[in-house]
Design a protein with these regions (language model features):
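Terminal beta-strand-rich extracellular "head" domains
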Residues: 3, 7-90, 94-133
Length: 133
């Protein structure tokens, strides 16, 4: 069974100001990768005594005074995972976004599509590297 080094970056902007946005690193090893088999990994511990979500990273949305042109970026830096999957088995990693409030989220861009120096466009990615044993 292999180990994997995972890193990610998520960039974008939501339509509601002053909100917290959370991301979760997800692993799925089931055949066909059904959503019901998603497992959050590399998350904080809520103590299992409350309903607070356990997340991997967090960041704040834009400020009220700059409501449509400030992209945010957060990172998951170098998490080592041991999924107990045999070589050639089913393995999927992905990043989930969790929004504090109901809003539209624009991935890799700001809310308004500006053709000017203040319109932001940044990438999002997940990198997975197998660690030689």
């Amino acid at each position: 069974n292999s180990k994997f080094l995972i890193s990610a970056q998520v960039s974008g902007e939501g339509t509601i100001h002053d909100n917290q946005l959370f991301i979760r690193l997800i692993r799925n090893t089931a055949s066909g990768f059904p959503g019901s088999d998603n497992i959050a990994i590399c998350t904080g511990d809520n103590g299992s005594n409350n309903s607070a979500p356990e997340n991997t990273s967090a960041y704040h949305g834009y400020a009220t005074s700059n409501s449509d042109s400030t992209i945010s970026t957060t990172h998951i830096t170098n998490h080592v995972d041991s999924p107990s999957v045999a070589a050639g088995g089913n393995l999927q990693y992905k990043v989930q976004i969790y929004l504090q409030s109901s809003m539209t989220w624009y991935l890799n861009r700001c809310v308004t599509l500006y053709d000017a120096t203040y319109g932001d466009y940044l990438p999002s990615f997940v990198t997975v590297m197998e660690i030689a044993q």
